[in-house]
């Protein structure tokens, strides 16, 4: 990762929107501020924002700055190829969409036991290594959502992989499902640099319950998001921490505490541990709002938004959540009770959530009769 200047990356996944389209004017401001502060790592994938992430990146970054000014990561996602022959045309379409001739990093996206078998059957890894040999990719890596044992298997079978992107934050650190700590330890064993995704857990660690927020506020040292990102960035071998920034204020906040990065001190680590305990006591739905589930939903249910209002009601117990459920998130889309239990959402969820059962819980909470 020799071209990276600092250890904060810009994830092009949660960009500001104007209706269905990316707010390009604000995104340009965000990109300009990020680069001006000395940061240069950008991360995208074709599935982000239904393809709009790549085209926004071209409009806001690659068409406006020299290629040597930024490091660019893209990904090969299982949904977009069925055979080995599909991979190269898809890759070339990604280059065109992003407006570049090469990618600094090309990641085998969302590797899990199921996805890994598909990638192997289609010789996706071999194709990626060939693209590297041709100079179209500088580094080949993976992004990963599965057990530490599965990660160890992949890195053992493909030791030439150069980086691993992991979900890593203080709530998931010892979570038995996500296994952030154990996966991180596997990367250390294999000597692979780690790129962190979801350091703020889809925004959940920026919008803490009041009692948890009070613990961090008492430190008088920064935003809730700042402690989450600094927690992740403070581990040896973690070379990059991605933040899916949604407005200029978030960019400015991240720049302020990551420009001259300092790991959490003992007092801050103790506070984060207390927040971790409070957060876990709330029994919240651990959705990161990646929105992979919404694209194939036949009932057009805005699943992450319904989970967000469910969490909000558990935390705040006020009328706002009911209002947003009935008047905003289900006004033009499906209600939780509209779920036909087809299971498409669960097959693509990186968090392995039991979405169908959770939607039934949401319906029971918000669609009470009488």
What label would you give each PLM region?
Residues 18, 32, 81-200, 208-211, ...:
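Glycine/proline-rich, positively charged
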Residues 41-48, 138-142, 240-242:
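Short catalytic-loop micro-motif centered on adjacent basic/acidic residues
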